């Protein structure tokens, strides 16, 4: 499917697909009309990459993760390590946001009490 169709179907902005292709994370094929075409499997990987980026994984780490995935089952341990590190960072962010929310709630209670 072409860039726009892929973007609509998978809710991936065309700019993001271009970024992934420029960084070797996504391979497309040139159609006779000059448009880029992407397969279903490649787009599913792009969706996973987007989730990982939204979770805080940096592009360089994402590229490393993708290279490891291409190497197969021998790299499962390293990929798990990267995912666990990403998860740990997410939990820390959640904790910090919860602390900020607790402070705001405290200030609200204080103002209501006056």
Residue ranges and their predicted role:
Residues 2-8, 22, 27, 40-114:
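Arg/Lys-rich, alpha-helical DNA-contact motif
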Residues 6, 13-16:
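Short glycine/proline-centered loop/turn elements that form peptide/ligand docking sites
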Residues 10-11, 34:
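Conserved beta-strand-loop-alpha-helix junction that forms the acyl-donor binding cleft
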Residues 19:
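DNA-binding alpha-helical recognition surfaces that contact promoter or target DNA
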Residues 27-33, 37:
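Beta-hairpin "wing" of winged helix-turn-helix
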